[in-house]
């Protein structure tokens, strides 16, 4: 059977925006990697309903810069930027260097693969039918100007005893064309019957 390679990893040389961590290290690589993982998990857990698409960590010798891409930037910033200050203080304790936090708004959340996958998982956890959730996501995505989309759900769908995979695809999705800008995301929905995996591919354009 043919397997699907992660489209982001496949295009690392071409799409430089795919890197989540922009830094290099020698001896303390392990320590910095664990710091990055902590930063991402802390931000994602603290702002579950802020529509966070991506958390990028950039480092210099003296500064750690955290860029949060969100569809609801106001939720993260808070009143007079108080929530951002809390994030800075929490990260600074772990990193032990000066921290800068920037919040960037995501203009079209309907085209963002991460936000689509999270939206579907929330619906599945609320016991909404996977077919209905997938069709709605595809409809909204194509309305906002995407050239193609594929959504896949795997697991005990609808509480069935035997796990299966269901998927829907609309428009063009050239996975083998390297210049094609394809966004990909994977998310897990924790339901009563077990975990359901949700995969989303979005073809934005070349």
UniProtKB/Swiss-Prot annotation:
Family: Belongs to the universal ribosomal protein uS3 family.
Matches recorded under InterPro entries: KH_dom-like_a/b (IPR015946), KH_dom_type_2 (IPR004044), KH_sf_prok-type (IPR009019), Ribosomal_S3_C_sf (IPR036419), Ribosomal_uS3_bac-typ (IPR005704), Ribosomal_uS3_C (IPR001351), Ribosomal_uS3_CS (IPR018280)
Name of the protein this chain belongs to: Small ribosomal subunit protein uS3
Any one Gene Ontology BP term: translation
Cellular compartments per GO CC: cytosolic small ribosomal subunit
GO MF annotation terms: mRNA binding; rRNA binding; structural constituent of ribosome
Superkingdom, taxonomy of origin: Bacteria
Subunit structure and binding partners: Part of the 30S ribosomal subunit. Forms a tight complex with proteins S10 and S14.
PANTHER family: 30S/40S RIBOSOMAL PROTEIN S3, SMALL RIBOSOMAL SUBUNIT PROTEIN US3C
HAMAP family linked: Ribosomal_uS3_B
Chain ranges of the KH type-2 domain: 39-107
Keywords: Ribonucleoprotein, Ribosomal protein, RNA-binding, rRNA-binding
Role noted for this protein: Binds the lower part of the 30S subunit head. Binds mRNA in the 70S ribosome, positioning it for translation.
PROSITE patterns membership: KH_TYPE_2, RIBOSOMAL_S3
CDD domains referenced in this protein's UniProt entry, alphabetically: KH-II_30S_S3
């Amino acid at each position: 059977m043919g397997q699907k390679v992660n489209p982001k990893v496949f295009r690392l040389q071409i799409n430089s925006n795919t890197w989540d961590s922009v830094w290099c290290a020698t001896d303390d690589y392990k320590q910095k990697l664990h710091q990055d993982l902590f930063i991402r998990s802390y931000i994602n857990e603290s702002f579950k309903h802020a529509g966070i698409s991506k958390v990028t960590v950039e480092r210099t010798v003296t500064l750690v810069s955290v860029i949060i891409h969100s569809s609801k930037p106001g939720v993260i910033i808070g009143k007079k930027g108080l929530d951002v200050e809390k994030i800075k203080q929490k990260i600074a304790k772990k990193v032990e260097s000066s921290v800068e936090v920037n919040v960037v708004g995501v203009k079209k959340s309907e085209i963002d693969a991460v936000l689509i996958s999270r939206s579907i998982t929330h619906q599945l956890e609320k016991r909404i039918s996977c077919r209905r959730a997938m069709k709605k996501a595809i409809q909204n995505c194509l309305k906002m100007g995407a050239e193609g989309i594929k959504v896949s759900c795997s697991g005990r769908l609808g509480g069935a005893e035997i796990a299966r995979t269901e998927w829907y695809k609309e428009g063009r999705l050239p996975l083998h064309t390297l210049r094609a800008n394809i966004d990909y995301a994977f998310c897990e929905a924790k339901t009563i019957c077990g975990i359901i995996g949700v995969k989303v591919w979005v073809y934005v354009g070349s």
